[in-house]
Amino acid sequence: MRKLKRWQIPLFAFAHFGPCMLSTIISVYLVDALQVAGFGSDVENWTFAAKTIVAVGLFSVLKAISSLMDGLVEVPVATFVQNLKTPWGRKRPAILVGTIVMTLSYVLFCFPLSLEENSVANSIYFGVLLTIFVSFFTLAINALFGTYAEITENDNDRILLTNIKAAFDTIQYSIAYALIPVFIGFGINIREIGLYFAPLAATILIAVALIKEDSTMPGAVKKYADDTTNVDDDEPVSMLEGVKWTLNSKAFRAWLVIHG
């Protein structure tokens, strides 16, 4: 993989900004906007329809399933990316596919099937979209973050890249948690706000433009210098074994209880 030039590092560090912003908005605001519970004022702007449009019990179960998938999907995603065979390498196609599907599911999440109260159909619809979103968000972001060690020339560049990324993370959270409530105060509905932010997903295209990989098609003359199968003597872990380890992890179970 071609290494980044020094001036390209801040651009590459910004690539994750949009998708991570959408992830914060859907998990913090849009999911809560499906029901009125917990909102003391401006309910008409904090929610989609100033009423509960999902069957709360059913949607809670489906939301917990999406949280479970959020943890489990990392193993098959890593396996998928590692074994991807395309003329454009592994990371760029994975980032593009993940971003496109993630963005479509995010936009669809802003359009309920109906505004009927306690709707079972809405519950299933939003539960499925949420699961699709977290799965393909993980695909895109893991593929992106997986390039950090490969695309930098040395430890100093890697530290610079991660530090700038952390700064953009702080900006992203500041906008999500401080600015969005201001928009709500101006009378803008959370669904509209969510749609306004959707184009930010395109920031990840910066990474797609900067990543330069060789073909991973069978028989390709060139091979990745970072191909771990050439330098790692450890036995590979199967996808099933990886899922089993994840399910048996106490840390993962605690995370699931908190976020589920």
Residue ranges and their predicted role:
Residues 1-260:
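Membrane-embedded alpha-helical bundles of multi-pass transporters/translocases
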